[in-house]
Amino acid sequence: MRKTIVSTVKLLLCVAVLFTVGSYASDWRLLGPEGGDVRSLSYDPADPNHILLGTSAGQLFVSQDGGNSWALFAHLGAGDDYVLDHIIFDPTHTATLYVAGWSLYNKEEGDVLRSDDGGHTWRALPAVHGKSVRALAMAPSDHNTLVIGALDGVFRSRDGGATWERISPENYAEIKNIESVAIDPENPDVIYAGTFHLPWKTEDGGQSWHSIQQGMLLDSDVFSIIVDPSRPTTVFLSACSGIYKSVNAGTLFSRIRGIPHSAIRTRVLKQDPKRPGIVYAGTTGGLWKTFDGGNTWELYSAPDVIVNDILIDPRQPERVLLATDRGGVLASDDGFDHYLSSNRGFSHRVIGGVIVDHQDPSRLYVGVVNDKDRGGFFFSEDGGQSWRQSNRGLDERDILSLQQADSGVIFAGTNHGIFYLPSFQGAWLPAAMILGKRPPESENVAAPASPRSKAAHSSTKAGSKRKPVTHVPKAPLEVAIATAKAPRVRSLQIADKVWYAATDQGLFTSVDQGSKWYGEPVEGESDFIVVNHFADGSLTLVSPKHIFLSHDEGESWTEISYPQYVTGLYNLTVVPDGSLWLGTREGALHSTDGGKTWQHLLGGLPPRNVFAVYYDAAGQRLLATALFAHGVFASKDGGRSWQRTGDAGVSIRSAMNYRGRLLAASAYNGLLLEQSSVVVESAADGAHAGERTPSASQR
């Protein structure tokens, strides 16, 4: 039944790729906002203060102080899509580490990665390269024995990952889609495997398997399995139908009562290393705890906490860390009677928009995607050193774009409409959005008031033609589109007379400073990604397949053609010399004749997936960002040659000049600030950073 997987020299050369730890801290600093998704936690048995944290974007963070603070440590995988659900230190030689990863986007991609130098370099183990590894365990009695659960079965290594053998029946319909594995603490041939359907067990290293579903509800997705090290016949497992316990090594399971249906998806179980009667259950409905081996349970966190992993300090079991969705790391020193966020230095946030305050550049505003009530809008009054959340009224909406009016009012384009913030202590209010052509009307109407004091914004910016603030409308007078069905507003631009919003229901415009917006298609196209307004009055509008250019504030549009080999559009920029820069899936394209002809430029730029080219007026240069580039590209010669900044360790979606440095919105790690000064101080306009793809909870 077992089949050995041979690691040939050719395969070794192809896939045993080294993933190195960059000197990220010397080039860039993560500003936050802190928090976000954490997938896994693991401590060093020789020094439990040394903890590694895994994310759903292939990153490892490290803590040297027991989880009180974090630093970006390593990036694993070729892209940003590896979900790192399992991290194991070899107890006999803790510089040896194993990490299991699976691709968020491709079921045919995944790895087990090994480091022999404490995580400074990594290599993918070639024999299991390409497997979507969802579970990883090390035998407590033999640390050279590793077992992985993948979508195509169960595999074992008895030499620290050098070679692997399949120990589940090949092409067997039931023992596949493995989500959890556990190894008996005394006998490494006794292995439990949980599938998307039910649990299985082998007692002879995979020679034979038998179902251990007796006592369980059918079609139970098995998330986690633990075996009591002090009494191996006691087995706990969690499934979508609840938590089960067996006292006879899986022959019969009993469903544990006491945890409500709302928390029934228990993603992880962990047992107190000193008191085996204490078991923690990390669920989608909070952290639950039992003191009597599962007979009774109590909720020990807020019920909306989604727990992905649990770490218990072996020296002091009352010290517990949780890896959570959206909330980052939660930490407790008293068994979770009390707990606090512990995210200093850790950010796994998808930035939808970032702007610098027009009058006070130490004030930064950020909108995030995918974090629901723990996301929304954040602001900093000290240049990103600390952040506060202000999302009341957003109702868990994602913020895809941000802009600030001259009055100081913040406007947010969300996944359901446009909102504005009259006061940081108040609630966000929806702007009226109406499908149809904008009727002729006066432009001299009151705008929403500033979220700061009227005195601070009693006059407009120098050179502005807009009127000062007079009052705050109590509510929109007309809402033709129901708020729940409001368009997805991917990009906002504020110009002198007309404001613009690129949405999935057309281009919306406002002439009353954001109180009311009218939207309609442009040249028959309704689904737009981004709109840009430039100093010369020109506008660019980009949809997934079309690009448009206007030189008269959007009164008329010209569709710009582009090469047929281009399969995806990201952004179109007009630079001061009048030339066009197009960011595409096939790289950066440049046109000097209004889009009649295009040149695919490299000169140091990546050949594919250039998000956008920006003009940095303060630095008198072009900036560009690209997928997986882990930095920002700059050109001082009009785009003929490009140099990349220092390694950020993470993918960057957009960048701006901020006080002489680059302020960048990363793909998954919040804001980053370049450490070295490069140009004169400048408060830049807002940057649009894009949207997130599926969450790691999706299989």
Across the structure, where does each feature detected by a protein language model lie?
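Extracellular glycan-interacting surfaces
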Residues: 4-15, 22-699
